[in-house]
Every structure is written in structure tokens, then in C-alpha cells.
Amino acid sequence: MGSFSIWHWLIVLVVVALLFGGRGRLSGIMGDAAKGIRAFRDGLKGESEQAEDETAKPLPKERDKDSARG
């Protein structure tokens, strides 16, 4: 139980190769995740600004009934 078999080492080797092998796959994955999070936050920010713009519009001035007569 204290020693690792060849299968344990093979699995560890595959995981390490997937994470750190090639052209910086881990950094590429993390960069894509960061871009996704940033886009999500920007989307939420845009929706809240749009909602504020809709609620912040001034109401048109209504004419008094007396001044409309002339």
C-alpha cells in the first residue's frame, strides 16, 4: 500500500504532460478562462449601465392647463 505501481506513475505522467506539455497549455487555458470572466463582468456592467440610463431619463415637462389656454 505504501508503494506506487506503474499505473500510478503513468497516470501522474499523463496529468503532468497535459498540464505543462506543449506550448504552455496551462497558461493558455488560464488565459482563456480570464478572458471569459472579463467578458462576463463587462457584460454585467453593460447591462447595469443600460438599466441606469433607462431609469435616469428626465421626464418631459408638462404644460399647465392654464398656460396652454393661452
UniProtKB/Swiss-Prot annotation:
Keywords from the named record: Cell inner membrane, Cell membrane, Membrane, Protein transport, Translocation, Transmembrane, Transmembrane helix, Transport
Membrane topology: Single-pass membrane protein
InterPro entries found in the cross-reference section: TatA/B/E (IPR003369), TatA/E (IPR006312)
Subunit-structure text: The Tat system comprises two distinct complexes: a TatABC complex, containing multiple copies of TatA, TatB and TatC subunits, and a separate TatA complex, containing only TatA subunits. Substrates initially bind to the TatABC complex, which probably triggers association of the separate TatA complex to form the active translocon.
Family to which the UniProt record says this protein belongs: Belongs to the TatA/E family.
GO cellular component: TAT protein transport complex
Segments crossing the lipid bilayer: 1-21
Function recorded in the entry: Part of the twin-arginine translocation (Tat) system that transports large folded proteins containing a characteristic twin-arginine motif in their signal peptide across membranes. TatA could form the protein-conducting channel of the Tat system.
Main location: membrane
Subcellular location: Cell inner membrane
Pfam families, sorted: TatA_B_E
Region (Disordered): 45-70
Keyword Membrane attached: yes
GO MF annotation list: protein transmembrane transporter activity
Full protein name: Sec-independent protein translocase protein TatA
GO BP: protein transport by the Tat complex
Organism: Phenylobacterium zucineum (strain HLK1)
